[in-house]
Amino acid sequence: MGDGERAARVFDLLNPIGQTLNTAAVQHYRVEPYVVAADVGGAPPYVGRGGWTWYTGSAAWLWRLGIERIVGLRPEAGGVRIEPCIPRSWRRVDVTIRRPGGGLAITIENPDGVETGVTELLVEGVPEGHGVVAFPADGHDRHVVVRLGSNKRDVPRRDETIGTPNAATA
């Protein structure tokens, strides 16, 4: 929980492109480098060989890890809760989410090289206090800036507002 470095390492382990960085690795892995494998062999002679690439929901789980837990964009009641948990080396992340009524152009700035800790959340330049940014309904994009830093501002999590512990944070 709150360990962006570890979350990124787990993501990299599951990301199929990491299994196919050179010709020898591609020949060993034997499945598509653009599809998440549901399993990777662990017993000889199949150690490291991918399998079951098109038959499961593995890609959806990898997507959720990357977007919802590392980048920290989680859908919530007509908007998006923004709680990044990123590697220290990520100094900036830009994401645009589009919906029929309008989108969110989100920039996460990490000048202090921290993993978590929202110090400022601005929507169209105005401070947002509750951590959930609503989607616009006017067909335009809203510009959102999230600043991370060592002086964490107290932005309540959804589960804190209903009094339950947060067990699902990266």
Residue ranges and their predicted role:
Residues 1-170:
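Non-catalytic C-terminal accessory modules of carbohydrate-active enzymes
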